[in-house]
């Protein structure tokens, strides 16, 4: 059975004609999956991977759009699956792009590390026909909602898949950061910055700051100070349902709240940052053979003894 659809060209992205080969039953719906493909526009390896993978993708699915500028509006149409070609940065961008319209994501790694975009193009070619027949599981990952509050008004907000971080700026004086948990003062940090990370983000900036790695399915957050003035300030794991509020007593001129690597806003004296569980989760497809410990072994070199190079 074959089908084709053409819906024209929209600024920033292209709706593609697509055809399905054999009719696949997507999760009992009696039809092939409807998919959107996302990728970084400036990566040559993304473009070459798309050219290579496109025939296989379209042979089993209905391609709604191929968007390499991250402008597709996910509120317009029902989409079953998003394929992201790139690295973990592209996965984070896709989470921002979908907003409250989160759709299951399958990541193909064309970047360097690839914690989230775990499948190589070769692995994808093997897994894709099985995925289209329902041989996968969906893992729901915690997301955070971050709000910058000034004069009791929310002036900026965003959702985070990795982390929200208060980061220092020139003249790089040490910061005094008050942390409130569920309305109660938890502690007062003296440090260069503070990270609130999800389990997904625990292997990012949090790990570099000495924080623990959390299993991705955990409903928890980790709060990690950056270069704390006192060694007794250690990373803290708390429930994902805890509502946090952060306040910097005297921020520097460039002190900012940064969400998944993007500046949400610069902080002024009296500002507060609220961090709590987002109303939606980020959904990732997991194919057979994937698991957290395998990813850690392969990506962090937890494979056993390191071979010593002969001098």
Swiss-Prot record:
Keywords, alphabetical: ATP-binding, Cytoplasm, Kinase, NAD, NADP, Nucleotide-binding, Transferase
Compartments, as annotated in UniProt: Cytoplasm
Pfam families: NAD_kinase, NAD_kinase_C
Sequence positions that bind NAD(+): 88-89, 162-163, 190, 192, 200, 203-208
Catalyzed reactions per annotation: NAD(+) + ATP = ADP + NADP(+) + H(+)
InterPro entries: ATP-NAD_kinase_N, ATP-NAD_kinase_PpnK-typ_C, NAD/diacylglycerol_kinase_sf, NADK
Names of the cofactor(s): a divalent metal cation
GO biological process, one term: NAD metabolic process
Uppermost EC category: transferase
Gene Ontology cellular-component terms listed: cytoplasm
GO molecular function: ATP binding; metal ion binding; NAD binding; NAD+ kinase activity
Record: active site: 88
Keyword S-adenosyl-L-methionine: no
E.C. no: 2.7.1.23
Family according to the record: Belongs to the NAD kinase family.
Function of the protein: Involved in the regulation of the intracellular balance of NAD and NADP, and is a key enzyme in the biosynthesis of NADP. Catalyzes specifically the phosphorylation on 2'-hydroxyl of the adenosine moiety of NAD to yield NADP.
Protein's recorded name: NAD kinase
Organism name: Rhodopirellula baltica (strain DSM 10527 / NCIMB 13988 / SH1)
